[in-house]
């Protein structure tokens, strides 16, 4: 396992090696409680390795540990030293990791090296404080991760990758000389080995009596000063904890991480540690984070001592806003969770000594969780958070450095950091609200430590698990952690951090038990992450992180943090939003940073921790109830064992292949450690601890399979995480920064939460990987990067999310695969080309062999394992890498935009075709793991719409009415259109009491009436030529429809007021019998058609078409008054249709009104021989007789002539002309008149 660990660390991203170291730390640290001093040193070395991951935060850890600004300065110096020390310690840790597997003595020697690196603390206080310092580093780092995750975490995640690489390189390059740099001035960060030693000692001390822990917490500020002076090399400090074997025995369940977390809480604040920790630890952790951030930014140069604790806190708070989200996250965490800040500090050391420290924190977490009585386990919680924060800090600095491997790691971390950043923003609400929340924050930060763990391997995972467990204990000791930090330091530590963790770790004192508990915590954390991720939607208001999730690396962090928030909001929606619940709020915020650090795993454990804080162990269970379905799925996946459910938590979190593969690789990386962890893991571990550990520690996750019995409760949490997994789907994208451990726990959860069995498969794979090699973990770590988490944030609320899965288990695994792909491509591509790649390949092959059976239940998970391993295994696996990159990065990130579909074209085949037919937007998860969002209709639907038969083009479709009726809203009564007139009377609407104009009606010129109107019997040819020539060319202007067919010569007349025009024409009519007629002999009764056809008068033709609008070649638009239409001869109403309009219109054009001299006369006198024709309004104004009873019309000359009336009655058919011709013979019978008719 150490060989695997070493290649990933050196060749792969520092996070890979750290993961391996973390795994080693887990293996060694869990037995720490049970092992004799020799084993304890071995554990210490492993813890140191875990802390080597934490060293990403070591400077922050030391700063947090050192309460005073002086200690901050010293810590800064130590940070620089710690970078070197971490490198040296890491080298020794890698060796010791192998030795740990091989022999405890080797581990001891490695632990001794680390111890030499650690700053000297007072013997008992020093041992406790040193461990506490380590715990503070991890706790503060983790807490800061949670609190600062919104900003600090984001920067730090990316930098953390680079920083971890840096650290991995530095340890290799610097040997043990860099140990000073490794110790960022934090007591436990003095050296990776020292921190692990402290962790071991702290395990003893913390486990031994909560008072010791409390004492360390109380003395943390002084002790912080102690590490200041000799941070890098203080063998006594590690040995004090080692010497504190009785403590370890007293609190055997407390893992090193737990001790770290607990101690940090105790040391940071002492008696008033909770409140002081808020102030001092917050400031300290800010300095730590600041130092760490600056150190990373400046490589080895630690920033000048940060401001005093409070000032530093503010400064750190400001920084995240500027360039480092990790600082903001740190400040938030410090503000909200001072204990968390301390934890973050511990995590820093844990990061430095990531392999052992990380593992130890997880073990401590397990111990804490198992033994609720052990309240000294608070320290381990702080340690775990520190590790995540260190990761963030290192990532940030690495981000600045932009090393290739570190860059990838940084991206992962950054993505995780983004996740954490968002939760931290939420968390600071709760954390700042309660000073004791900070301790819980520390616990939660321990949970965050897994974020580191993903980079380290399992170490950071374990701190996160520890943190979560610690927070679970915090829940149990909510009173102390929530409010009474200062009164009972021991109580505070054990209650807030240790208590929960020890409850998780209750009975397992052996390394195996501890590892099993750690794995359970990891699973729990995984579940919490998944819970957090879906609650992320719940907590969306408090979580802007979904948008960060959108970013590749930032997305991972955001997704993780969102997951943390989501899970917390799911089961304890108020946890994040509610600072009211100290533990709750604390957990949520730390979880966020953890998520940022580790990816989804961190966030999920934070959720578990959150619930643990709220309800302690019940809280974890609460997480499971919050997502009952996922628990069920976890149970389904639990078949392997409780441990499998535990792993299932990470696997369930990423029910898809990508996560499963990540898990498998992680398991391979941490195979040896996981085996130890599995042995240590015992059913005693509460479910929440197991869940916390799953999320907390990749090692714990890997050990999940062995600790399946313990995972039954954890399985519930895993289920919860799985339920949140759909929301977590975006998390993988954000998790990219997360390490393989983070990837393992975080990446799969979003996709696979829906598919518990897939998770279960993933879990067995994890177990297989566990026994094989640590390299696979790096492959998993990239998974936290997969876009799905961001996709979920971007796309929709997890609760509203619709997943279309052809083969849910297969598709989920496929998703897993995708999740793994992207992270692998980003973070693990380069590692696969290094010595670590060879180790990873070997581990991958072993893992594949071992997990083949387990993978079969979830083909998707196995696919993911294969892809991730291939990418991780070797550069030769370029195809696998590219496939992952395209499928995971291209498909997973674009999955939100359905770009993913294009990448996994093969995956579209299965159930995508039928699923595409769904009308509403949905997420399509294909068996190959490709995930895409479908929000458009299928091609068939589009074609159907396009092929809809268009309405047959109506004759008037393109026509526009020239005029608007007065009934229309568009009618303008003030400026009426002079051309809008009745076709008969040539008057506008409402003239002479005629009312509104009706229309428009269309009349055609293709009729006999038109031809008759334009032609006269004697001049057909001439009239035809004239009409065709004049009307069509000049007057009508053929193609201008919508315009009145009136020549320009009449424009002035048509525009003139109608009444005045009519009056003028009437005068003309009276003066000359026919104004428009050139024939002076033409009588008034003569048909006006003659005048119209007079070639000499153009105005006659103009008047013919007056009131008409040319709409087409043969079509005219006409409007008419009701009375004009009623009195017309040819118009009649049949049903709702007006018939005979064409004939009436064209016939009217043949007759000119005798009163107004305009065409369109529709009534004529019934008197015989009287040809007078007039418009209805004109006739009425001229006192014509219009009888509506018999529809008889007489002009004003004949209305009083009884003879005329009589004959008209008798001879209604006879024209007026005839009647007038025979007035002297009224007596003759009607027949006479009939005969006399023309």
From Swiss-Prot:
Phosphoserine: modified positions: 453, 682, 749, 753, 793, 799, 1099
Residue stretches of biased makeup (Basic residues): 861-874
C2HC pre-PHD-type zinc finger locations on the chain: 1089-1131
GO molecular function ontology, one term from the record: zinc ion binding
Region (Disordered): 22-83, 96-150, 169-250, 264-694, 739-915, 936-955, 1057-1089
Keywords: Metal-binding, Phosphoprotein, Zinc, Zinc-finger
Entry keyword ATP-binding: no
Biased composition (Polar residues): 58-72, 96-110, 188-204, 433-450, 463-472, 755-764, 1071-1089
Composition skew (Low complexity), residue ranges: 35-49, 73-83, 125-145, 272-287, 309-334, 393-406, 549-570, 632-641, 832-860
Residue list for modification Phosphothreonine: 642
Pfam families xref list: zf-HC5HC2H (PF13771)
Highest taxon above the source species: Eukaryota
GO CC term (a single one): nucleus
Zinc finger (PHD-type) boundaries: 1151-1199
GO biological process, one term: regulation of transcription by RNA polymerase II
Basic and acidic residues bias spans: 523-536, 678-688, 937-947
The protein's name in its UniProt record: Uncharacterized protein CG5098
Taxon lineage: Eukaryota, Metazoa, Ecdysozoa, Arthropoda, Hexapoda
């Amino acid at each position: 396992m150490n060989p695997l660990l070493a290649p990933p660390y050196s060749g792969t991203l520092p996070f890979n090696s750290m993961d391996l170291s973390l795994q080693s730390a887990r293996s060694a640290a869990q037995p720490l409680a049970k092992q004799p001093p020799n084993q304890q040193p071995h554990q210490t070395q492993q813890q140191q390795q875990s802390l080597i991951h934490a060293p990403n935060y070591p400077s922050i850890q030391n700063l947090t540990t050192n309460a005073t600004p002086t200690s901050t300065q010293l810590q800064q110096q130590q940070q620089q030293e710690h970078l070197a020390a971490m490198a040296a310690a890491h080298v020794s840790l890698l060796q010791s990791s192998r030795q740990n597997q091989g022999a405890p003595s080797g581990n001891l020697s490695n632990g001794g090296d680390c111890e030499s690196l650690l700053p000297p603390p007072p013997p008992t206080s020093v041992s406790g404080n040193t461990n506490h310092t380590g715990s503070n580093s991890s706790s503060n780092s983790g807490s800061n991760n949670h609190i600062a995750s919104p900003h600090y975490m984001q920067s730090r995640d990316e930098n953390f990758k680079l920083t971890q690489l840096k650290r991995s390189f530095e340890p290799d390059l610097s040997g043990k000389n860099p140990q000073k740099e490794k110790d960022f001035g934090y007591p436990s960060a003095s050296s990776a080995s020292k921190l692990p030693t402290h962790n071991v000692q702290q395990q003893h001390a913390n486990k031994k009596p909560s008072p010791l822990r409390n004492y360390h917490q109380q003395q943390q500020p002084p002790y912080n000063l102690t590490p200041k002076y000799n941070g890098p090399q203080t063998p006594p400090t590690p040995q004090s904890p080692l010497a504190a074997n009785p403590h370890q025995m007293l609190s055997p369940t407390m893992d090193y991480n737990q001790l770290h977390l607990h101690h940090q809480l105790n040391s940071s604040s002492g008696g008033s540690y909770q409140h002081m920790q808020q102030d001092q630890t917050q400031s300290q952790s800010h300095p730590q984070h600041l130092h760490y951030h600056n150190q990373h930014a400046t490589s080895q140069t630690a920033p000048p001592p940060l401001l005093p604790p409070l000032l530093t806190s503010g400064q750190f708070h400001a920084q995240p806003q500027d360039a480092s989200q990790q600082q903001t996250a740190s400040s938030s965490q410090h503000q909200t969770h001072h204990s968390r800040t301390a934890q973050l500090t511990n995590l820093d050391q844990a990061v430095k000594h990531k392999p052992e420290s990380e593992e130890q924190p997880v073990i401590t977490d397990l111990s804490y969780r198992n033994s609720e009585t052990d309240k000294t386990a608070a320290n381990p919680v702080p340690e775990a958070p520190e590790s995540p924060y260190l990761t963030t800090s290192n990532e940030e600095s690495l981000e600045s450095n932009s090393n290739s491997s570190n860059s990838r790691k940084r991206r992962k971390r950054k993505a995780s950091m983004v996740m954490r950043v968002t939760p931290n923003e939420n968390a600071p609400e709760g954390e700042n609200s309660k000073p004791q929340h900070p301790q819980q924050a520390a616990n939660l930060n321990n949970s965050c430590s897994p974020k580191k763990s993903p980079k380290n391997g399992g170490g950071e995972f374990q701190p996160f698990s520890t943190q979560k467990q610690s927070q679970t204990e915090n829940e149990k000791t909510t009173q102390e952690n929530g409010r009474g930090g200062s009164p009972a330091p021991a109580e505070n530590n054990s209650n807030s951090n240790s208590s929960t963790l020890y409850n998780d770790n209750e009975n397992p004192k052996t390394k195996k038990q501890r590892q099993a508990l750690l794995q359970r915590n990891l699973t729990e954390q995984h579940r919490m992450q998944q819970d957090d991720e879906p609650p992320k939607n719940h907590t969306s208001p408090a979580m802007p992180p979904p948008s960060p999730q959108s970013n590749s690396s930032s997305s991972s962090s955001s997704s993780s943090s969102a997951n943390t928030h989501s899970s917390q909001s799911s089961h304890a929606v108020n946890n994040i939003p509610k600072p009211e619940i100290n533990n709750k709020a604390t957990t949520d915020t730390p979880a966020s940073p953890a998520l940022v650090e580790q990816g989804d795993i961190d966030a999920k454990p934070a959720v578990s921790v959150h619930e643990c804080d709220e309800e302690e162990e019940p809280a974890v269970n609460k997480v499971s109830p919050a997502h009952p379905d996922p628990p069920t799925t976890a149970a389904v996946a639990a078949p392997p064992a409780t441990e499998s459910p535990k792993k299932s938590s990470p696997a369930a979190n990423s029910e898809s292949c990508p996560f499963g593969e990540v898990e498998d690789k992680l398991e391979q990386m941490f195979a040896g450690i996981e085996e130890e962890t599995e042995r240590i893991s015992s059913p005693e571990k509460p479910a929440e601890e197991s869940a916390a550990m799953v999320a907390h520690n990749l090692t714990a996750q890997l050990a999940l399979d062995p600790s399946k019995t313990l995972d039954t409760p954890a399985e519930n949490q895993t289920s919860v995480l799985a339920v949140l997994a759909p929301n977590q789907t975006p998390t993988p994208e954000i998790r990219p920064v997360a390490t393989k451990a983070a990837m393992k726990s975080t990446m799969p959860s979003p996709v696979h939460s829906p598919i518990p069995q897939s998770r279960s498969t993933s879990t067995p794979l994890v177990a297989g990987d566990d026994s094989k090699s640590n390299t696979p973990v790096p492959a998993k770590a990239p998974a936290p990067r997969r876009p799905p988490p961001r996709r979920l944030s971007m796309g929709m609320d997890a609760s509203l999310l619709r997943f279309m899965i052809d083969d849910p288990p297969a598709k989920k695994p496929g998703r897993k695969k995708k999740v793994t792909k992207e992270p692998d491509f980003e973070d693990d591509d380069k590692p696969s080309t290094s010595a670590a790649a060879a180790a990873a390949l070997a581990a991958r092959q072993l893992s594949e062999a071992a997990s083949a059976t387990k993978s079969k239940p979830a083909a998707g998970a196995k696919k993911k394992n294969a892809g991730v391993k291939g990418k991780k295994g070797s550069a030769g696996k370029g195809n696998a890498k590219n496939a992952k990159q395209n499928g995971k990065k291209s498909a997973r990130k674009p999955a939100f935009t359905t770009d993913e579909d294009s990448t996994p074209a093969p995956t579209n085949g299965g159930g995508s075709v039928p699923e595409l037919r769904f009308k509403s937007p949905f997420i399509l998860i294909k068996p190959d793991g490709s995930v895409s969002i479908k929000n458009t209709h299928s091609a068939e639907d589009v074609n159907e719409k396009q092929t809809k038969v268009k309405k047959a083009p109506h004759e008037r479709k393109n026509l526009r009415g020239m005029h608007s009726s007065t009934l229309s809203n568009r009618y303008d009564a003030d400026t009426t259109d002079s051309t809008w007139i009745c076709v008969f009377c040539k008057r506008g609407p409402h003239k002479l009491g005629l009312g509104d104009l009706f229309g428009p009606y269309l009349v055609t010129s293709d009729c006999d009436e038109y031809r008759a109107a334009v032609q006269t019997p004697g001049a057909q040819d001439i009239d035809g030529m004239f009409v065709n020539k004049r009307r069509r060319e000049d007057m009508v202007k053929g193609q201008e429809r919508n315009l009145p067919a009136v020549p320009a010569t009449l424009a002035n007349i048509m525009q003139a007021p109608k009444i005045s025009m009519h009056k003028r024409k009437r005068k003309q009519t009276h003066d000359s019998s026919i104004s428009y007629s050139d024939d002076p002999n033409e009588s008034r009764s003569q048909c006006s058609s003659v005048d119209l056809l007079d070639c000499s008068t153009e105005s006659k033709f103009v008047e013919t078409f007056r009131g008409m609008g040319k709409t087409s070649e043969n079509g005219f638009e006409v409007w008419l008054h009701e009375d004009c239409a009623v009195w017309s001869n040819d118009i009649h109403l049949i049903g709702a249709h007006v018939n005979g309009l064409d004939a009436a219109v064209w016939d009217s054009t043949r007759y000119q009104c005798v009163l107004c001299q305009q065409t369109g006369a529709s009534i004529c006198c019934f008197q015989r021989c009287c040809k007078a024709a007039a418009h209805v309004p004109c006739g009425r104004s001229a006192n014509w007789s219009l009888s509506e009873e018999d529809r008889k019309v007489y002009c004003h000359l004949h209305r009083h002539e009884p003879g005329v009336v009589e004959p008209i009655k008798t001879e209604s058919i006879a024209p007026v002309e005839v009647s007038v011709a025979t007035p002297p013979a009224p007596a003759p019978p009607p027949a006479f008149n009939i005969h006399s008719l023309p």
